[in-house]
Amino acid sequence: DGYEHWLTDRRTEADALPEHLHPVADSGIMDGKDALKRLRTGLSLLTDADSTSTASQQARKAFAFMNRTMREQRIRSQIAGLRAADRSLTVDQASKVIDAEGDKAASWRAFQLAFILMQLPSIVDPTVPRRSGDIPRAELLFFPTGGGKTEAYLGLAAFTFGIRRLQGVIETPSGVIDGRDGVAVLMRYTLRLLTSQQFLRATTLMCAAEIARQEDPATWGEEPFRIGLWVGSSVSPKRFAEAEQQITDVRNNDGNSAYGLTVLQFSSCPWCGTLINPKADVVAVKATQRVHVYCGDKLAECPFSPGGSAGDGLPVLTVDDEIYRNPPTFLLATVDKFARLAREGEAASLFGYVSQRCERHGYKHPDTATAVCGAQDHAAKKEGGRTYPKASVKAVDRLRPPDLIIQDELHLITGALGTAVGLFEAAVDTLSSWEMGDGDDAALVKPLVIASTATVRNAQDQVRKLYGRQVQIFPPQVLSV
């Protein structure tokens, strides 16, 4: 209602403008009214009291999940930051510092919550025209640097994690789509340095999501929430053997340096801030072809430490073939990495195209290397003080492809880079599409595309050429830039 009153005041201002400015002013106010309508639609989805409305019930659960995990992400990120600045601080001491800030330590800004509410209908119902119509739209979050754009789209990502788990298996004209696993959100960056900076914040969110899942697997499923970093081979390893060799080399070196250990992307635990020992806390397991990164907490108070409640350590994947075999819920990538789609068939698993699943090694695509999982059955095996039970390979349905694609720093995708990225967008859009409904009523579902930037120019033209979509800028500028 407050936004509606504000728009009414802008209408009065517009009427007082010179006649030649009225068309532009009218267009700006219409954009504001459209945002108001969408905001109310999203809010009504959460407040619908109809007990028979499955969509509203699921939306409320996913919204609560989002708020819980984002609160934990904010608080835990600050705790880790305080402990990084002062290693003498304990987790309890850092927590008290954050608690003293009250609600300010973890609260939404108005534009963040409004942006999320506006997108909820497109996530809950994948067939809505704004997302999957003949002329779908891309949503552009335009806000100054440091204003909180990251939290806005991380919040929407968390909602997406939750709603997919609640919707579960969906019948489609071409067969079953399984939303209980697979990549839910695909987030792309242009600069590799920027990816590393954001990876820590996103990992903290995934830690919060995984703890919530473990507390209530009946609601949030048996499959772990994980985050993956899919970037160039100079930044992270392509194969398990490369990662294993890195770990061996670091352990054989003098000192405690993590130089050359690209499988480890942060020096301290994103959940509690405890330092990670590259010689002891990064473990390669041949039996599963997995690399586990643990928090360095020796008292096992952190759930992601050895002996902690999480079991497998931090929910992080940084090796390409691990990512293909265990498609992470949240995948962070650089735009150049999508060139691998033309050369690595197993990367199709990121879009749900899997044919089998090994109980030990993960999902299989016809191009999965037989050196990783070439048998139909595996005998029990002991390694590192742990026994891995016998495992078999079983046929599975297609995993649900990404529902949300986030492009950070859109203004950098221009010129020659924009031309190259645009070539892959059609492929990504096609790989992420699937049909929902029955017979003639079946609708082609496309991913929701969100872009963010602190500076924008010719956004309509840029988005049309990159994604073949119209663009909706939020917040609408109305009468003032």
Give the positions of each predicted feature.
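N-terminal helicase ATP-binding lobe
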Residues: 1-481
